[in-house]
């Protein structure tokens, strides 16, 4: 946003990837999008010092790659769960992430205490915290034993175009199953061409035996909207065939999900619209 207002922006990332826990293809595409916008992106940066510039003007960030000067600095270090409540006195244990340990029903090591949201030390998502809260209310009041389906929880990064994803990455899925994956460029999606925003891609990971969908990750126009269909697909344990057999409105960005599903069986790059 600042870059589009004419401000020089530099992004310094400690990791070798811009989005380290996302698919590498998505991370590389996101970096390319930012660089196209004129954002200066540097990976593998170790910040050694931050000091005021000469004559008290601006700031200087000293890194292993050199110095960067800027009028304003935003330091994004993540969030830590607020657990400084002497929880051990209540028999509440912490997990390896420093958050509160819970079971699938969000019950802590003290069976009379539940925990939800950012305090768990997992994904920091408002929608996830809300769902955990409502499920906990049902579990405590009616003993319904409901669980959060973490596999179908989507996420998004609101760059333009959006990065979004749901389910397992290829690296995660390959440790558990025999899998196949496909990548479709947004330049092969009719709606993307119409909008003039063909940057991006969609990647799908599936079981190589029964074709169940394990993960969908994308970067593209309205990606944060498109990923919700993928979340429902994972929630319902659907297969590639289910997506292929579902009629999608043409032209839409959501059609990219059907196209990447079809790409497991055919070359969709030169296919006429709406063909199954």
Segments predicted by a language model, with ranges:
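Rossmann-like dinucleotide-binding cores of NAD(P)H-dependent redox enzymes
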Residues: 1-55, 124-130, 138-172
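A short alpha-helix-loop-beta-strand transition element characteristic
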Residues: 93-95, 143-154, 177-182
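Conserved beta-strand-loop-beta-strand element in the redox core of flavoprotein oxidoreductases
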Residues: 51-67, 73
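Flexible, glycine-rich terminal cap/loop adjacent to redox cofactors
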Residues: 158-276
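Residues forming the flavin
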Residues: 2-3, 8-20, 59, 68-69, ...
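FAD-site-proximal beta/loop scaffold in flavoenzymes
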Residues: 68-142
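Short acidic-glycine loop/turn motifs at beta-strand connectors
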Residues: 53-54, 96, 208-210
